[in-house]
Amino acid sequence: MNIQQLEYLIAVDKYKHFGKAALACHVTQPTLSAMIQKLEDELSIKIFDRTTHPIRTTDAGDEIISSAKAVLDDITELKNKAHSLNNVLAGKINLGIIPTVSGFLIPNEIFDFLNQNQKIEMNIHEMNTENIIKSLKSGEIDAGIISTPYHETEEFFSDFLFNEELLIYSSYDNKDEYFIGSEDFNSDKFWLLEEGNCLRKQMETICHLRENSLKPKNLEFSASSISTLIKMVDKTGGITVLPELATQQLSEEQKKKVFHFKKPFPSREISLIYYKPTYKQKMLNEFGAFIKEALSKHLNYNKNPKDFSIIAPE
């Protein structure tokens, strides 16, 4: 029995298909099948029922898979602990990140961090805040990047990363006005993210949608991503709210549709949270410091913080 065989087991259990598992493990299907068969023979247990489509993990196999995952987790922990004791920035970080941040941090700051720290491996999972909290508690991830303050994070450790302004993206006609209040909105197309997204709640708070001071005809429409919101405004007009990092990736023509709210400018706070300090703390600290430094000079909030108001994501 070896580590590779355990990894193959978990892959087949995940994909329920030998071909897909082999592809994910970067080996040929015959090699993977032979290694699993060898392990089944060694343990005298049938782990997978190959007669079903998709492949089914047997009851005994479920127990073996659970133990295999625990063994691999222990091995990863041992490696990371050794790196930590040697004061080396190396190991694996499982990171959960909310979708309205991931699309702008991953291709830029996170890639830069990993390029500068080649011995750190990062597995990134795009999740909403609720699932990040659950995954932290269960130990599935080591840390999460979310919008704070959030009521369920009181038992967590939190490392502030950055504040970013929330801006209007609109086909608003009066191009002479640079600052807009929610009372100035005159549109029956207010595009929102889907329920469960913390940025949607911030949109509702800023624009007083909960109090019905603005009641668009199609308020029930909800998008799954910021890029969809941008496309809806570009194609059909209307209004939405974008975080500042999203506006930095717009074309020059699109940037003409960006407006500030009136003071105090609404903004959101983004933090790195984790359940408890671990041997991965040095890596997490370095990662957080890198993100702070990378964004400190590029966000409006840092120019004059007293002009901004943090909007809670709930």
Feature-to-residue mapping (PLM):
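Ligand-binding cleft/hinge of the Venus flytrap
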Residues: 110-117, 140, 200-216
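A short LG(V/I)-centered, amphipathic sequence patch enriched
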Residues: 40-59
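Beta-alpha-beta core module
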Residues: 153-159, 163-164, 227-277
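N-terminal short secondary-structure element
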Residues: 1-29, 33-35, 49-51, 64, ...
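Alpha-helical linker/hinge and terminal dimerization helices associated
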Residues: 42-43, 64-86, 287, 301
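Flexible hinge/capping segments at coil-to-helix
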Residues: 156-191, 195
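Central regulatory/effector-binding core of bacterial HTH transcription factors
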Residues: 90-153, 223-225
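Secondary-structure junction motif
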Residues: 176, 188-212, 280-282, 288, ...
